[in-house]
Amino acid sequence: MTSIGATFGINTYSFTQTMRASECLHYLADQGVREVEQMLFPGHLWVSDEGAELAAVRRALDDTGIRLTSVNTSNVELNITAASAEMREVSLGLNERFIAMAAVLGAPALILGPGKANPLFPLSREVLEGHFFSSLDRLMAVALDHGIEIYLENMPFAFVPDAKGMMDLLARYGEDRLKICYDVTNGWFIGEDPVEGLRTVAPRLGLMHLSDTTRATYKHDPIGAGDMDFSAFPQVLSECGYQKSCVLEVISRTPNVDFPASVDQLKHLGY
């Protein structure tokens, strides 16, 4: 297999250090890709690119016919539940600008990290949840103004990394419009059964991320490079009523090889 094709949405993380977003979209379109999760990353597409580059990305989307599933960013660098108000303010301010960019680009959703606790001396759960809920109050207002959905992603480094914990947290917050981007790889890495994770988040499932990892080392490797079993996911997604494309979030220095190979592996499993 020499091209990526249109079976999956493709996250552009692997291209953030080598291509501008507009160039990347044309490259992916030439590979047969029809849906993209657009990363917002300095040098690829960033909040400072509000003029010609943002217009170039919009033109690339129009020219190629690619549809954006969502916009995403390097959430490990941001923290909406940080102990310092200054760090929370920077993180929230950037996310507000990401939402505005999503609206300009025609992306329906922003992928949001729930925030992190200091692993050496964490804030109390009550304080973390308070920061989280206050952050959601602010970001939800901006998202609603722009017609953008927020998909919270399960992340191993988040203060709430698991499917049930996220569902319980969102139930306490009480906003039915908040959805979850369930990353099966992140679920596997923390010891969760991602099949059960998908079933748990089904009422809020907005998007699914795919890549491979082991439980020993955290990766987003090509399919087959880790020890995950992907065979059960198509049936579970059908049970959950999920009808969107899954997004391949493989992070690789050789995406021209690893994306087509990953697609080939998954197609043999019934995707």
How does the language model describe each region?
Residues S14-T16, L40-P42, S74-E77, P114-N118, ...:
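Active-site-proximal loop/turn and secondary-structure-junction residues that shape catalytic pockets
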